[in-house]
Swiss-Prot record:
GO terms for molecular function: DNA binding; DNA-directed DNA polymerase activity; hydrolase activity; nucleotide binding. Its EC number is 2.7.7.7, 3.1.11.-. InterPro entries: DNA-dir_DNA_pol_B, DNA-dir_DNA_pol_B_CS, DNA-dir_DNA_pol_B_exonuc, DNA-dir_DNA_pol_B_multi_dom, DNA-dir_DNA_pol_B_vir_insert, DNA/RNA_pol_sf, DNA_pol_palm_dom_sf, DNA_pol_type-B. Belongs to the DNA polymerase type-B family. It catalyses: DNA(n) + a 2'-deoxyribonucleoside 5'-triphosphate = DNA(n+1) + diphosphate. GO terms for biological process: DNA recombination; DNA replication; viral DNA genome replication. Interacts with OPG148. Component of the Uracil-DNA glycosylase(UDG)-OPG148-polymerase complex; OPG148 and OPG116/UDG form a heterodimeric processivity factor that associates with OPG071 to form the processive polymerase holoenzyme. The gene is OPG071. PANTHER family: DNA POLYMERASE CATALYTIC SUBUNIT, DNA POLYMERASE DELTA CATALYTIC SUBUNIT. This is DNA polymerase. Catalyzes DNA synthesis. Acquires processivity by associating with a heterodimeric processivity factor comprised of the viral OPG148 and OPG116 proteins, thereby forming the DNA polymerase holoenzyme. Displays 3'- to 5' exonuclease activity. Might participate in viral DNA recombination. Does not perform OPG116/D4synthesis across an abasic site. Pfam families: DNA_pol_B, DNA_pol_B_3, DNA_pol_B_exo1, DNAP_B_exo_N. SMART domains: POLBc (SM00486). Keywords: DNA recombination, DNA replication, DNA-binding, DNA-directed DNA polymerase, Early protein, Hydrolase, Multifunctional enzyme, Nucleotidyltransferase, Transferase, Viral DNA replication.
Length: 1006
């Protein structure tokens, strides 16, 4: 029997079992049940003394146990690490057992199961059926997984089944209540193992009149009275709410491979199951594959107060307890963890994922026709957009113009769409799927048949969006890749944090190397310095800036320095200069390079003046070996990705290489995380110290380098910054560039693993050509060992606000001057939620203007400053006098929470007062909108005091009174503060700011 593993899960009844859900080549689903064990590692001496004897035991052979406590010394008299060798046993017990002196107890039982039996969680196997006992059709028991799964076979493709769903609930206030508000719609996108896709929506007929129901039937809707009458081929079905809920129960109890929702764990599934129990007393019941255990669908919460989010809200995740092998997947939770977005609402996520440039085909009266294909945007973007358009009802044009779809024509790689839209002047516009321009509260207030049918379209679109996002993020291949890499079940891949997922690969490595790492002392945590961030040399750059990044800097630092808890010889600290001098002189004699590397770190305690960590590089340590495995596997999958021919293979290999990249980059963080199995304080701080020296070394050879006559003269000798080696240190290097090229280079900024180097040219093509040659020369001549850099991009018209804050037009390494550059806003107000739309629009306008001025190159920095400030004053005065912009542009949002230090915090007071006077109260954890409002007769206010008292909560019913105005000065001051930080002339900026606002601006720290 050939099977592919698709999920592993446990039953937690009286008899615990582990189950595998697998699929055969013919699409048949097979479940295999295994005994569940708890695992313990003990020495032979303890094993022999156990009474009663272990249930099962396997010999692990001779293993080396190393004490990895850090040795801190004030001199070079460092004691050797404690190390012992003994025969070890792996004990399997069906129930928890207290065994003294058991080791390796930090690893998960499921990881022990996979590794001890030689099973890959996502592997394909030809099963030896003599080790299988049939329980029922499609379910077998296996007591010997090692022999049953002994024959691994090449991966083969299998079909999967999915249920994507969304619901709409009636509400008259802010949130629906399960006790009083019925479900009005449930929409499903059902994909079976044959690949057949069914789209259907159930409409609650109890919210319609009998006349409307009859009209709906006349218009093609199916009306049913019971579950038995359901026809899944019909798109629209009318039924009572009880029938609607029973159909949901029937669907959710099926064994799909995936049931996918958006925030469904917290809302949709919970609402369905609670409403079902309330109206019928029935529950959604899952049964284990052997049919011996039944559990009710239940949502349980996991609160991690140690990982508090914004405003002190605990990180809460929601989980479905099922035992039938279906993976209940919440896209909302997944995207929150994997993407950094301004908002995690479904419309914001879809806007980010599905957009493309569309060409204007026709302009009519209040309507416009757009066409999109591979000629209007990058290949594939129009096709992805067109797929979503099949169920889409609204399209967002140019970021914020929401237009209703009138007609649409869709083909394989493109689309044509007619939108209800004001006439727009340009020939091309960005089209995206954002928020539908509907007010659900008002729709329920005016509810009738037409509205019910409209809502059905919105609901099925949201259900389909779950499918589109599922495919866009490649969740299925990421799940399989994670299971293989982390040695975890598919259902648990996204449940754990990095400190847990690393345990599987670490255990695998320790068993391969016959190593056990133990600690006898309590882990101590001290702060340490992070990566090197340079101060920007200036604000605005008319010349191009070349961006070079170290490839996997921290993983390669760990490999280069052999940084690992067991390779740490010790840490030498000094309390005075004399002690430090003596230690420095003797260190290199006792621990000579390259076998040893000595790393100067910042002292861990205030009474120390120096701290030096010493690592032995003769035998590769656990962390470097782990990282080398990850990086080698990533390189292997990247190579396979290039050679892959099918889209399935490409998706799998891309997910695998990405997963290895993520896990490799997480190792550095885990070295400094006290609860991690890889915790090593000295290794973590040595990693950042070596990383800082590497970025300083690269900056030192590039800053002041010159290219002329085909020769590149680096600014400094190419000397290894850690120890002398036999490399050629001559800074003059022959290039393959034309001999008439004459350029100078200047380092202008750097951050952790990247260097920004200005070239005195505005030619994009030449800049890219030179940067690629620089990349080759740096990797061949400047860098050493396993360090490599990569030319990432040319930044044109770079505007540096401060460290980690900049705006630029990016030309990637694979582009040219004719390519459309990407606008990058890193760490700036355009990416923040606590900034008004007015502010974002204005700052975007002024950055664009600055960028154009830099491109033209006609003005010096003083002229640019004068021109920008003069224009800004005109714009602000004009807005203040006309007061024409709508209130929506000035609204801000904030999350309501109670984690304030002061009991009378003004934010809390604002919400409390609002809740006293409004029936729709603001709940804890909810975002609310507010704006600064003052009396209309208040003149321009220079000195802003007590601005919190002008905050006013903006709800649906708020209207700006004739005796009120927007307190523009608050917004203007914040905007101007950001703009003056873009300009180079501080004197002019201070003068302008004092004249407008009566105070000096705050300049960002360089």
């Amino acid at each position: 029997m050939d099977v592919r593993c698709i999920n592993w899960f446990e039953s937690h009844g009286e008899n615990r079992f582990l189950y595998l859900k697998s699929r055969c080549r013919n699409g048949e689903t097979v479940f295999i049940r295994f005994p569940h064990y708890f695992y313990y590692v003990v020495t032979d001496e303890i094993y022999q003394s156990l009474s009663p004897p272990p249930f099962n035991a396997r010999p692990l052979g001779k293993m080396r146990t190393i004490d990895i406590d850090e040795t801190i010394s004030y001199n070079l008299d460092i004691k050797d690490r404690k190390c012992s060798v003994a025969d070890m046993w792996l004990i399997e017990e069906p129930k928890k057992r207290s065994i003294q002196n058991a080791t390796m107890d930090e690893f998960l039982n499921i990881s022990w199961f996979y590794i001890s039996n030689g099973i890959s969680p996502d592997g394909c196997y030809s099963l030896d059926e003599q080790y299988l006992t049939k329980i029922n059709n499609g379910c077998y028991h296996c007591d010997d997984p090692r022999n049953c799964f002994a024959k691994k076979i090449p991966r083969f493709d299998i079909p999967r089944s999915y249920l994507f769903l969304d619901i709409e609930c009636h509400f008259d206030k802010k949130f629906p209540s399960v006790f009083i508000n019925p479900i009005s719609h449930t929409s499903y996108c059902y994909i079976d193992l044959s690949g057949k896709r069914l789209l259907f929506t159930l409409i609650n007929e109890e919210m319609l009149t009998e006349q409307e129901i009859q009209e709906a039937v006349d218009r093609g809707c199916l009306r049913i009275q019971s579950l038995m009458e359901m026809d899944y081929e019909r798109e629209l079905v009318l039924c009572s709410e009880i029938v609607l809920l029973r159909i949901a129960k029937q669907l959710l109890e099926l064994t799909f491979d995936y049931v996918v929702t958006f925030n469904g764990h917290n809302f949709d599934l919970r609402y369905i199951t609670n409403r079902l129990e309330l109206l019928t007393g029935e529950k959604i019941i899952f049964r284990s594959p052997d049919k011996k255990e039944a559990v009710h669908l239940c949502i349980y919460e996991r609160n991690q107060s140690s990982h508090k989010g914004v405003g002190g809200m605990a990180n809460t995740t929601f989980h479905v307890n099922n035992n039938n092998g279906t993976i209940f997947f919440d896209l909302y939770s997944f995207i929150q963890k994997s993407e950094k977005l301004d908002s995690y609402k479904l419309d914001s996520i879809s806007k980010n994922a599905f957009s493309c440039m569309g060409k204007v085909l026709n302009r009519g009266v209040r309507e416009m026709t757009f066409i999109g294909d591979d000629t209007t945007d990058a290949k594939g973007k129009a096709a992805a957009f067109a797929k979503v358009l099949t169920t889409g009802n609204y399209v967002t044009v140019d970021e914020d113009i929401i237009c209703k779809v009138i007609r649409k024509d869709i083909w394989e790689n493109g689309f044509k769409v007619v939108l209800l839209c004001p006439t727009l002047p340009n020939d091309t516009y960005k089209l995206s799927f954002g928020k539908d321009d509907v007010d659900l509260a008002q729709m329920y207030k005016d509810y009738n048949l037409n509205i019910a049918l409209d809502m059905a379209r919105y609901c099925i679109h949201d259900a389909c969006l779950c499918q589109y996002l599922w495919e866009y993020y490649g969740v299925e291949t990421k799940t399989d890749a994670g299971a293989s890499t982390y040695v975890l079940p598919q259902s648990m891949v996204f449940e754990y944090r990095a400190s847990t997922v690393i345990k599987g690969p670490l255990l695998k490595l320790l068993l391969e190397t016959k190593t056990i790492l133990v600690r006898s002392e309590t882990k101590q945590k001290f702060p340490y310095e992070g990566g090197k961030v340079f101060a920007p040399k200036q604000k605005m750059f008319s010349n191009n800036v070349l961006i070079f990044d170290y490839n996997s800097l921290y993983p390669n630092v760990c490999i280069f320095g052999n940084l690992s808890p067991e390779t740490l010889v010790g840490v030498v600290v000094s309390t005075n200069r004399l002690e430090e001098e003596i230690n420095n002189q003797l260190l290199l004699q006792k621990y000579p390079p390259p076998r040893y590397i000595t790393v100067h770190c910042e002292p861990r305690l205030p009474n120390l003046i120096s701290e030096i960590a010493i690592f032995d590089r003769s035998i590769e340590g656990t962390i470097p070996r782990l990282l080398r495995t990850f990086l080698a596997e990533r390189a292997r999958y990247k190579k396979m990705l290039k050679q892959a021919t099918s889209s399935t293979e490409k998706a799998i290999y891309d997910s695998m290489q990405y997963t290895y990249k993520i896990v490799a980059n997480s190792v550095y963080g885990l070295m400094g995380f006290r609860n991690s199995a890889l915790y090593s304080y000295a290794s973590a701080k040595s990693c950042t110290s070596i990383g800082r020296r590497m970025i300083l070394y690269l900056e030192s050879v590039l800053n002041g380098a010159e290219l002329s006559n085909g020769m590149l003269r680096f600014a400094n000798p190419l000397s290894n910054p850690f120890y002398m080696d036999d490399r050629d240190i001559n800074p003059i290097v022959k290039t393959s560039l034309p001999i008439d090229y004459r350029f100078r280079f200047r380092s202008v900024y750097g951050d952790t693993d990247s260097v920004f180097t200005e070239i005195d040219s505005q030619d994009v093509d030449k800049s890219i050509e030179i940067a690629k040659e620089l990349e080759r020369l740096i990797n061949n001549r400047v860098l050493f060992n396993n360090f490599k850099i990569e030319f990432e991009a040319v930044y044109k018209n770079l505007i540096m606000q401060s460290k980690k804050k900049y705006t630029t037009m990016k030309y990637s390494a694979s582009s040219n001057s004719k390519s459309v550059p990407e606008r990058i806003n890193k760490g700036t107000s355009e990416t923040r939620r606590d900034v008004s739309k007015f502010h974002k629009n204005m700052i975007k306008t002024y950055k664009t203007r600055l960028s154009e001025m830099l491109s033209e190159g006609r003005m010096n920095s003083n002229q640019v400053c004068i021109d920008i400030l003069r224009s800004l004053e005109t714009d602000l005065r004009s807005e203040f006098d006309s007061r024409s912009s709508p209130l929506e542009l000035f609204m801000l949002s904030r999350m309501h929470h109670s984690n304030y230090k002061s009991a009378d915090n003004p934010n809390m007071y604002l919400v409390t007062e609002y809740n006293k006077n409004n029936p729709e109260t603001i709940e804890l954890g909810e975002r609310y909108y507010f704006a600064y409002i003052c009396p209309a007769n208040v003149p321009w206010t220079k000195k802003l005091v007590n601005i919190k008292t002008y905050e006013t909560i903006i709800d649906r019913s708020f209207k700006l009174g004739s005796d009120q105005r927007i307190f523009y000065e608050v917004y203007f001051k914040r905007l101007t503060s950001e703009i003056v930080n873009l300009l180079d002339n501080k004197v002019l900026c201070i003068s302008f700011f004092e004249r407008m606002f009566g105070s000096k601006p705050t300049f960002y720290e360089a």
